[in-house]
């Protein structure tokens, strides 16, 4: 399998454990752009067991809270996209 999110950090790693990692993506347009990337290759949220989906979303919500406290943005955008790379992020 050839998956760039399996093979590369895909940004500056801010936090990681055995389940997933949080990376800061270099973006001039979105300076606080972060991704939560699953450690193993999974294409869709529904491919995860319910406890895994909940665990992943806890990390997403922790990132949102941290960004709100540190960056104080007008709005936080949460998105689940896989249109470029078929790896859950």
Feature annotation, model-predicted:
Residues 1-88:
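HIT superfamily nucleotide-processing domains
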